Amino acid sequence: MNAIDAVIDSFSRLPGIGHKSAARIAYHLLKQGPADALRLAEAVSTLHEKIHPCTICGSYTEDEICSICADETRDRATICVVGFPQDVNTISSIPEYRGLFHVLGGLIAPLEGIGPDQLHISELIRRIHEGGITEVILATNPTIEGDTTALYIQKILQDLPVNITRLASGLPVGGDLEYADRLTLARSLNGRIKF
């Protein structure tokens, strides 16, 4: 395998990048010159050295505590529970949410050998017991694994003095009804709100 094929193969192993996209990236790096390629290689090579989970929420950070957990202006009574660190970036990108986060580190997926004991659920319970939390928002993906995880956490937390909510799911803004699947339509109907 030559050098270009090796780079294409490496990029195509990344999620969401197929062979054609990987080839475009490889040829773009060649066209840009060695400085850009070196900058990318250095950034990737130091990723695991510099980035680690926040000791409070589990999101990725370069510091012991991430910038969200360290921000005293955030709503400390609300915790948004997500499956993965990248979900923190997605939700924190909207100004409507100013609370804290808790990363589970995955979702319950028995077929993949992932059960509740592999997730950071006990840490969530500890954070609630430490006090000050009044609402837990379950923001796991609207998939079988995400729903299973949310239901499990809801059952575990139901006797604790917190409100447990789940993100609404339904039709996307600008979406056409004819393209919606049956489950999405059912959830949209069941979760309808007064207008």
Swiss-Prot record:
Any single GO BP term: DNA recombination
Ranges of residues in domain Toprim: 77-172
C4-type zinc finger locations on the chain: 54-69
Family: Belongs to the RecR family.
Pfam families (alphabetical): RecR_C, RecR_HhH, RecR_ZnF, Toprim_4
PROSITE patterns linked: RECR, TOPRIM
Function statement: May play a role in DNA repair. It seems to be involved in an RecBC-independent recombinational process of DNA repair. It may act with RecF and RecO.
Single annotated GO MF: DNA binding
Protein name per UniProt: Recombination protein RecR
Keywords: DNA damage, DNA recombination, DNA repair, Metal-binding, Zinc, Zinc-finger
InterPro entries: DNA_Rcmb_RecR, Rcmb_RecR, Rcmb_RecR_Znf, TOPRIM_dom, TOPRIM_RecR
